[in-house]
Structure formats: structure tokens, C-alpha cells
Amino acid sequence: MKKEEIIQAIKEMTVLELNELVEACEEEFGVSAAAPVAVAGAGAAAAGAAEEKTEFDVVLTDAGSEKIKVIKAVREVTGLGLKEAKALVDGAPKTLKEAASKEDGEAIKAKLEEVGAKVELK
């Protein structure tokens, strides 16, 4: 299989399938896809705290009692299919969107909380 074929296959995968692929690769090769964290000095830590965070991860922490409405809302904001959205909601806590702008994150959070879900911006 050529590199281009692999890239094309990845492009055609859903978010849920990509997540499963990453987990399988981590398990198979004994590695972690988490970004390495560098230890910074005290001066750098103080400067970083002063910066306002511009990108947020939208995390569904609990579906609440109206699971069907939450699944519909998740499909709307993520573009996932019914099966993928249901699996995501059933598996809460799960990240719905990574590196979302503050406005997008707040809009997604408001839409999901409107139907009874509990959502965090991290």
C-alpha cells in the first residue's frame, strides 16, 4: 500500500473511526499521541498565564435525560452520522470539537446545554 493510498483512506474516515485508529496505533506500537509537555521556567509560566486562551476543546461530559435530543444536536454541530453521534454521546465524557474558537465553542456549548447536555470548554 502506497503512502498516497493510506492518506486517501484516512481522509475518508469519520472522526470516530480516526479516534479508534489512533487508539489502535498507540496500543500496537506502545506510544502515546499526546503532545509532549516541556518543563518551563518560572518566568515562562508567568508569561503564559497572562495570555488569554483562544482555542478550546468542547467536551460533552454528560448527555442528561434527553439523550435523543442530545444525539441530534451532536450530529448537527459535528456533522457525524447517527451511529457515530450515538456512540459519542453514549461514551461521554468525549471531546466533540478540538481547537474551536471561543465563539464557536460557546455556540456549541449553548446548543447542547439547551437540550439538557452538560458541556465543558477546556
Swiss-Prot record:
GO biological process: translation
Domain of life (superkingdom): Bacteria
Keyword Magnesium attached: no
InterPro entries: Ribosomal_bL12, Ribosomal_bL12_C, Ribosomal_bL12_C/ClpS-like, Ribosomal_bL12_oligo, Ribosomal_bL12_oligo_N_sf
GO cellular component, one term: cytosolic large ribosomal subunit
Family that this chain belongs to: Belongs to the bacterial ribosomal protein bL12 family.
Function: Forms part of the ribosomal stalk which helps the ribosome interact with GTP-bound translation factors. Is thus essential for accurate translation.
Protein name as annotated: Large ribosomal subunit protein bL12
Biological classification of the source: Bacteria, Bacillati, Bacillota, Clostridia, Eubacteriales
Encoding gene per record: rplL
